[in-house]
């Protein structure tokens, strides 16, 4: 055992994406978290501190290291070795933004270790480059709600910090990999279908920006881009939608690629919906979440706390 000083911690919220028809462009932060505690060390080492991340690679084949190295390489710098304790309650491969949170944390890790002073736009671009789209990553980076578009040379984003809604999630204990969820989607749409699907998405975005939650819910349920094709992968979706509607929920949708199912309901009514869904779906985890205002948060240890490490 050796001693090393704690340098800083990085906390990143999880996220949901799509909200129905906002496919690959609408993301919202959720109050599940990934936390990195970073210590000075003589070699790279990652240690899991929660069951969710118990299988993470301990060395430089870790996604967090690989992403941080890409940032360092871009700036022509070399990452100093650190020991990283990793804690998370964002379940993997469940549609709650676990990979996006890790990518955002990794970018901030490089930013802090190398004192890069990256701008928000740079962070969002890097995260979107790795993820392929800005929805989950942008929500985790900034908190609140994000609507975005990633292009080859720029990422565009519109942000809404304060989202006054309760979010109840039903999390099945099986995984749905993003690749499998994308494989069930059609290669293309007819012109007529594309126009209809885009119109639904446009109204969703307008309703989100004005926080017209009944209209948001209506559009969530009218998605034509992906949910009609993914219901076969998540049989609980229609059942959750039915139970939630009886309790007055605004709308229900897959969270990202699933299998997590997300329901929006008036602030203060989420606990009642959570209890009802827990009774109806005992084989799933059911949780009441909020939409955090803050995205990634860095805290430097003011007392240079000393920890025992390997």
Curated annotation (Swiss-Prot):
Keyword Transmembrane in record: no
GO molecular function: ATP binding; homoserine kinase activity
Binding residues annotated for ATP, in chain numbering: 91-101
Cellular component GO terms held in the UniProt record: cytoplasm
Reactions catalysed according to its record: L-homoserine + ATP = O-phospho-L-homoserine + ADP + H(+)
Enzyme Commission designation: 2.7.1.39
Localization terms from the record: Cytoplasm
Enzyme class: transferase
Annotated metabolic or biological route of this protein: Amino-acid biosynthesis; L-threonine biosynthesis; L-threonine from L-aspartate: step 4/5
Name listed for the protein in its UniProt record: Homoserine kinase
Gene behind the chain: thrB
